[in-house]
């Protein structure tokens, strides 16, 4: 079983996907974290967010994941970067980098490889991102598109930054999310959009437990299997 959860920044995708996967005894693949690892690779190489920058960085870049219990660990080469990719610095550049055609081609290939392998190994995988149900696994049997009010999304993202020790204001985070929304909706390659057969779920007033229940219930009601 392959389950995709897409939506804008701060809509609750990652936490919901991770906990739903644990409830279902599947594994969780955070595609956004993989893009953040690529962005960190660009920053370390001091490469511009351009096609030429991608062509310089990608040949020597290796992004992979490992699972330790229910937790997904992200690696950039041999370096564990799960915590570092959540920095505000990475957040400011990841959207520009993720729109580059060479980056998206590389990442979609990796996400399909890992997703299929983990679904075969564990019986199912839950992915979250922005194009998992439209590009990565367009035939997934369960697709959910999560949305939420922008102020609520900014509040959630601010909490993530504060937990990581970042000093940013609510206004800065809200502006960052507005910019990310615009970039995600208008980019030429794989813009953020709802798949025609995706279920729309507004999480603005929902608790995490309610969000997880929603996903788990939809998966249990679906007997198909998609790749």
Swiss-Prot record:
Gene3D superfamilies: P-loop containing nucleotide triphosphate hydrolases. Keywords: ATP-binding, Cytoplasm, Kinase, Nucleotide-binding, Transferase. GO terms for biological process: pyrimidine nucleotide metabolic process. Transmembrane segments: none annotated. One of its GO terms (molecular function) is ATP binding. The keyword Transferase applies. The keyword Magnesium does not apply. InterPro entries: Cytidylate_kin, Cytidylate_kinase_dom, P-loop_NTPase. It catalyses: CMP + ATP = CDP + ADP; dCMP + ATP = dCDP + ADP. Its EC number is 2.7.4.25. SUPFAM superfamilies: P-loop containing nucleoside triphosphate hydrolases (SSF52540). GO terms for cellular component: cytoplasm. ATP binds at residues 7-15. Coiled coil: none annotated. Pfam families: Cytidylate_kin. It is found in: Cytoplasm. It comes from the Bacteria. Belongs to the cytidylate kinase family. Type 1 subfamily. This is Cytidylate kinase.
